[in-house]
Amino acid sequence: MAAKFRQLNEALDWVFEAPKKEQVSRLKEVASSDQTVVPIVRMGVGAEKPDWGLPEGMPEVAKIQDDIPDGMGETTLKLEWRRIIQFTNPKANLKNLPPWKQEQNWLSIMEGLHHKEAKLITAVKDRQLLKLYPKLEAILKDLGIEDYEKPKGKRKSKSNK
């Protein structure tokens, strides 16, 4: 039985500290009690490509407190999921708002989340989850995700001597 996690980043850390053989079962265990895991993983690796209507990266004006211990954020991804998923739904009332107001709503969600969860959902929005959790790529096929965005590796520059 999986331990209960308040934050999704804690659950994912628990999943990927296990040996590779156990990671799939641990992720499924976490997903059985948290409805946000499956869509977050699918969107984060690029298997689903919704239009978030938001600029890339963390908002520059975000006042994220990074000195708060795990489990002590004002809110969590689970609690905010209903609001977050509206950014991906083209028929949501949120999409009727001007872009600056949508960004303001996103900013208020980011500032309420724990800093690690804010980084996690930003990586999901930008389809960069594999950069945050590189071990996830090894188990995607076991999860049934075959079409995803592979992370672009850093190219080493050749020096001419």
Name each model feature, range by range.
Residues 1-161:
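N-terminal nucleic-acid-engaging modules of covalent nucleotidyltransferase systems
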